[in-house]
Amino acid sequence: ASTLKSGSISLFTFAYNLQSVPVGIIGTSYSVAAFPMLVKSFSQKNMKDFIGQISIAARQIIFWSLPIISLLVVLRAQIVRVILGTGQFSWQDTRLTAASVALFVISLVTQGLVLLLVRGYYATGNTKKPFLTNVSSSILVIVLAKLFIYIFNHNPEIISRLEILLRVKDVPGTVMLALPLAYAIGSIVNFIFIWILF
């Protein structure tokens, strides 16, 4: 992070907090609501009902997350400007934060599903697998962030394509987009591992 522009970590944190709202409202709500039924099904050794409860909650998380992803991608600059656009928060900061939000929401569905599957593990009394996969994915995020920062700093054509895609071509400090990109990829990989081990 020391190689990034001043204020990059703040922008990353703002974007992370914005994308955490739908994860908290949708993913956490459905996973917490499903937990008692998962515990009941597992204690009665009714695996068909257990998988059914996971399936119902997963469909609801996906159903509600997809429109929110669309809204966040399309209206990201407006949302960031309304919520954060006061005081010293410049238009360039708004654009970088909005681009970060767009990268974060790539993994919005998988973040919600991870919360659900972790509750499924907890319902069975298995806390080791989700702990190890979450630690592994956290390490992966750190490694990917360092790798992407290096790549973006040494390959201007790659960062240029990302800047064009996210419409931040003329904004300085776009290397910080390596952080939300690494987080999104790490979240997707975390979901894949938790799903495979489930």
Segment roles from a protein language model:
Residues A1-F198:
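Membrane-embedded alpha-helical bundles of multi-pass transporters/translocases
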